[in-house]
Amino acid sequence: MKKTIIALALSFMALVMGAQPRQGKVQIILVPDHADALYKAGEQVNMKVMTLHCGLPLDGATVKYEVSEDLMEPHKKGEVTLKGNEGVIKAGSMKKPGFLRVKATVEHEGERYIVRSTVGFDKDKLVPTSVMPEDFDAFWKRQLSKLEKVKLDPKMELLEERCTDEVDVYHISYRNIKGSRMYGVLTVPKGEGKYPAVLRFPGAGVGPKGGDIAHAHKGVIVLEMGIHGIPVNLEGSIYDDLGSGILSWYPEDNLNDPEKYYYHRVFLGAVQGIDFLQSLPQCNGVIGTFGGSQGGTLSIVTSRLDSRIKATVAYFPAMCDHEGYINGRAGGWPHMFKNEANRTEEYIRTARYYDVSNFARGLQAPVCYLYGYNDITCAPTTTCATYNVIPAPKQVIIGENIGHWTYPEQMNALWDWIIGELKSVK
């Protein structure tokens, strides 16, 4: 039996933590003939392919390849036998804005190795396909008004075993709508004075939180949130059972009703987190949002729904441009409309109120954004289109070869940006 090793593949931990995936002993290297991996509509892509074995040339390999538009079915397949350890894949072109992906496969000594390379066509012209409801703002104004009747009832438990000489760590909770609570781990600098704060939102899944001690050491309060209304300091097996049971596919729960959809409670609870942070005597009231994937969703949504947010970091946000699939191109995670059976009037109506591209259109706080061309979880067609419609001051970090992960240097840059932005607010 052949084993498959996907270069730049994602384990669940890589997805959550943003870690760079491992490489196999055989490397397939794909290099576009444009140095920036960007093309104009109609230009041809010639992709150089090289193979290495333990860092040395692997000569004469047969490379099978597929070419597709972002997350679409392949429209071209072929193979090339390398001369020495190099060859060229003629990938073709696109006639419209978007991303073109080459998937290359090599079999060697009973193992199968896979790598992807993606290039952009007129990417700055991409815009979301999803429709913004005429009552979008009115809908969310009504939902936010429900928080006015909710007493915060904050609770904090000092986690002495996690505290350091410079940072206190707490397991916290506060009330949300319908009698639910939101939970998280709060890290607070011990020094005198008041500090800015960051709401840090999680990627998809179910699990515990450890608290962001490292960035609290840099002089910011960090509230690392959970979204499921359960404590975030329980035994790991509890989250495993929930993740494989009742929460196995929560992103589509109650998608037929915008006021009962799973993320309704989550979005409102995220906004309520601002009130929690501002209630802390150590907080100076300057708050930013930070997150990737599902966390990028919540970072943008919270910033859009509450003007108290002063800076926003979102990397490869999920839930962008759900209707892409209905319009013949990639849609956002969780890809609910890839399944044609889900394309009902009720589901589409609800999804529009929760589409991140619709929230992005109204952002006001400065934004630092990141996405990768090789991301097959939160497709670049969706994240790039969403970035393009942000009207706020913005900057983007592009990862031409990254998937659903980041390099450490990129994550450091995101944190340096938001800490600098928050500390500069007078």
Feature annotation, model-predicted:
Residues 282-292:
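Alpha/beta-hydrolase fold nucleophile elbow
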Residues 33-37, 148-192:
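N-terminal cap/lid segment of alpha/beta-hydrolase-fold proteins
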